[in-house]
Amino acid sequence: MVSNPVHGLPFLPGTSFKDSTKTAFHRSQTLSYRNGYAIVRRPTVGIGGDRLQFNQLSQAELDELASKAPVLTYGQPKQAPPADFIPAHVAFDKKVLKFDAYFQEDVPMSTEEQYRIRQVNIYYYLEDDSMSVIEPVVENSGILQGKLIKRQRLAKNDRGDHYHWKDLNRGINITIYGKTFRVVDCDQFTQVFLESQGIELNPPEKMALDPYTELRKQPLRKYVTPSDFDQLKQFLTFDKQVLRFYAIWDDTDSMYGECRTYIIHYYLMDDTVEIREVHERNDGRDPFPLLMNRQRVPKVLVENAKNFPQCVLEISDQEVLEWYTAKDFIVGKSLTILGRTFFIYDCDPFTRRYYKEKFGITDLPRIDVSKREPPPVKQELPPYNGFGLVEDSAQNCFALIPKAPKKDVIKMLVNDNKVLRYLAVLESPIPEDKDRRFVFSYFLATDMISIFEPPVRNSGIIGGKYLGRTKVVKPYSTVDNPVYYGPSDFFIGAVIEVFGHRFIILDTDEYVLKYMESNAAQYSPEALASIQNHVRKREAPAPEAESKQTEKDPGVQELEALIDTIQKQLKDHSCKDNIREAFQIYDKEASGYVDRDMFFKICESLNVPVDDSLVKELIRMCSHGEGKINYYNFVRAFSN
């Protein structure tokens, strides 16, 4: 820095001051080049930057320099060489015109908006006259954005012309692939380029805004009219006061629907509703207590909310015109809550008192909603096909896997081996059938009947089993309700019709009479009297009839005498008393006949003296054809 002495003071330390404005202390530059020639200039400033007055040009020199033309000194200037040729793709490389535009898109099937404004950027590439349309990506817009039209040359009309940068301007409409774009503005480079090419640009326009987007950007306005209703007072007054209603939801009209019971709680403190489901034990449902959580329930929605799918609707005060209140819950009234209809059939005593004090409603009777069980459907059996018994055929319809009909085990145990035998004749117009005799065996254990025809020599009719064990249906019964013959239907003179054949009962044995007398309640007095009279007549025959019978059948008298002799001779023999029951066990058809081999096996097991000469004679007289023996007369010789 320069120290300048103050005038009038000695040049001593402390009397000089530094000038802070002077910082350059080099010598002035006098040598330089001008138009390629080295020249020397006189210095104009000294050391420290002080201007030198003696090296300045005079006014005359300045005027001479101002009036003297350079041509007089340097001559005519040379013409500049022509510029080199530059191709368009090199000259306009990476030079792009940008225009701001928008297009309008229709929005069908929407209650919120009818059209949508979509803003785009149109890029024009000068190097190859191609264009592209790009829509700026907006977050959470819900539509596909980005590159709408890729870079390409775009057709302007149907004649094959393409868009050129001369066709683009602000404030015009351009149609690209059937979609009209409105150009509103461009960037600074585009404006300078078009103006340099002599194109007059239209004034810029304001970018159109999407009405729905702007609506969503606005804050939610709530115009609430001041009300004199005090919610705090309601909360404090009705705290812990709940109305309880009993309701049902009847969904039986739909497939697999049912009627389910619910409890509706209405909280008076804040007008909220809660629905609980009533579960029963083993009802097959998850024991989740709540069907609907505690909340306010809308009663009347706005018009748009009715058409809009309620499954995605967030209910607020803006979508609801009226909410459910306590006066809407009345016994005997149906309510639709969130799409489900509930019928209120009862309430608790507190709710009845509240409605009486608040609304003056006293008639709230309980409604009986219990449904009576429908009568059981009577199973209709298919027609009887004629095979087997009706019970056997019907058993195939009761289960997928057929089972045998259930039997009365007690009856079978009580009446085991109890057989009632009757002698009958066939009622037939054929003369040969009048002399045929049949033995009816009625099995009390199973109510079945078997018929056996004793074989008669030289009769021309094969005897033996006539009908196996089966139940015989009465002629006046139907297939759907069959009535079978029972013990009370068999008496002297009774007509038994067996599958179209009529038989007349002629005789019976003493066991039948004993059974009828012990079970007189099952028989009519006439039937019991007929059996008793018949047995009485049979035990006291007339002398003339006996003499005639002896003359007619001498073999019977001989058989009776032989039986009496055997009874006297074997009086003290140790044979068993149940010999008759032993033969009946092996006589499955209750015909009174057993095979010869089986006969001797039974006699051997019961210690019967078959080797005795009288017993051999009795066996010979009781023998019949086909190797069978009539054990009825044989057993008489061993009975007491």
Curated annotation (Swiss-Prot):
**Could you tell me which InterPro entries the record lists for this protein?**
DM10_dom, EF-hand-dom_pair, EF_hand_dom, EFHC1/EFHC2/EFHB
Q: What is the effect of changing E322K?
A: In EJM1; no effect on protein expression; defective mitotic spindle organization; defective cytokinesis
Name all DM10 domain ranges. 93-198, 239-359, 416-520
Q: By its UniProt entry, which PANTHER family does this protein fall under?
A: EF-HAND DOMAIN C-TERMINAL CONTAINING PROTEIN, EF-HAND DOMAIN-CONTAINING PROTEIN 1
Q: What does this protein do?
A: Microtubule inner protein (MIP) part of the dynein-decorated doublet microtubules (DMTs) in cilia axoneme, which is required for motile cilia beating. Microtubule-associated protein which regulates cell division and neuronal migration during cortical development. Necessary for radial and tangential cell migration during brain development, possibly acting as a regulator of cell morphology and process formation during migration. May enhance calcium influx through CACNA1E and stimulate programmed cell death.
What does the subunit section of this Swiss-Prot or TrEMBL entry state?
Answer: Microtubule inner protein component of sperm flagellar doublet microtubules. Interacts with the C-terminus of CACNA1E. Interacts with alpha-tubulin.
Q: What is this protein called?
A: EF-hand domain-containing protein 1
- Gene that encodes the chain: EFHC1
